[in-house]
Amino acid sequence: MKKTKKPLGYIAGNLFNEAEVAQRLKEGALLRKWRPDVEWYNPIEAPINDKSTMPTASDIFWGDTNKILKSSYFIADMTNLDLGTAYEMGIAWTINFMHKFFKKTKNTKKKKKKEKNFPIKKIIGVLSDIRVPTAGKYEDMFVPYGINQYFLGGCLDDGKVVHKFAEVEKLLKKK
């Protein structure tokens, strides 16, 4: 009997201080609990990102990018704009864009192979900053929060944005 391979999920977000590392680890544990049928890749847990082994920029880029390309789920912390997270989101968005672009391809065999190698991603952005709900009530320079609209637009173009990580669970249950 052939063993079915689990789909891959990717967890994107800042990884540069103790609080961010703790948050990524918490997210990984929750995602594995909510969707045990998915193999969740969490860069902070990956050997390629172990700074004691002195990985090169290329090692990190390709180690993580290969996982993004193969993932079916892409969950990103958008709260503190991180260049790495934005770049990862761009890769995930581009794969989905290419699927749409080539949707009219007549060659179904090639199409199936592309989908298997680079699956369409369910993209979910988490924008959990506590200032977001009231940001529109302020004026001028007193607006307490802003997000890069290009980054937000890319996520909303092909995904969803939630304001609490707990809301991700409900979206993951939707097919």
Predicted regions and their residues:
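Conserved catalytic or regulatory cores that recognize and/or transform ribose-phosphate-containing ligands
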Residues: 1-175
